[in-house]
Amino acid sequence: MRQQSSLARHLASAAVAAIFAVGLCGCQTTSDVTGSLMPKAEASPDADPRRTVEVSGERYRANPKDADAALAYGQALRAAGQRSQAAAVLEQASIAHPGNKALLAAFGRALADNGNFQAAFDVLTRAHTPDNPDWRILSVQGTVLDQLGRHDEARDYYASALRIVPDEPSVLSNLGLSYVLSRDLPKAEETLRKAYASGRADARVRQNLGLVVGLQGRFAEAESIVKADLPPDQAAANVAYLKQMLSRKDNPRSGSGRVPVASLNAPD
């Protein structure tokens, strides 16, 4: 009971503690969102991010005006956690190529990575058009609006994305987290279960569902969700992560009173 009353207090000051996994390029280049969004910097899962930065950086420095080289370098920097540098590279490229929507999408995402949410939203708006909307960018715009506390507006963007790709799990997952941030945990669970049941959901959806179930006090059920059908080592890691995230809601010093959000999902 104490945990649930504590949750209610912390939810009152909810803020997103999340990673934007946002697949933002007009092509299928995704890197780490949202949701959704995980642009993988066009590397294999076993690639060394530092090596990718080195290789793409050499190509970029050889021709800084090359839009594709700038895009690849920016994505590699983001994947390596060098967010400020990624934003700087993508900003310069966007200035040099103002009509390149893939660059605008990546730049908007990089701005969001750095906490510049309003600027990110404005740039993302230029990355697609009303007559040719990109559902991935719509979902990312939703996550940015959620970061700004504009949850009703965010859900309009998720709804627009879902009209293009019905039942897309990455969008549903972001929508579910939006409900978490506005303290509607039953609706969040319902939405995340729908995402999880699709058979196309990634590990973040599983983690987010487990987190929402745990936030409602059903800890045994939450553990069973995050470790189901996984090898023992991965199951143990997921359970440890769940406990870490849940502990943050009861420890004001660990998260500034924020509700923990496992991760936003990025459409691939």
Question: What does each of the following model-derived ranges do?
Answer:
Residues R2, V16, G23-A72, A76-A80, ...:
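N-terminal leader/linker segments that initiate helical-solenoid repeat arrays
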Residues S31-S36, G199, A203-V205, V212-D268:
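Terminal, low-structured helical/coil segments at or just beyond the last alpha-helical repeat
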Residues A62-N63, A96-H97, A127-D131, I164, ...:
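Structural marker of alpha-solenoid helical repeat scaffolds
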Residues A67-D68, K101-A102, D134-R136, H151, ...:
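Helix-start (N-cap) detector for alpha-helical repeat units in TPR-like alpha-solenoids
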Residues A72, A106, S139-V140, N174, ...:
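Canonical tetratricopeptide repeat
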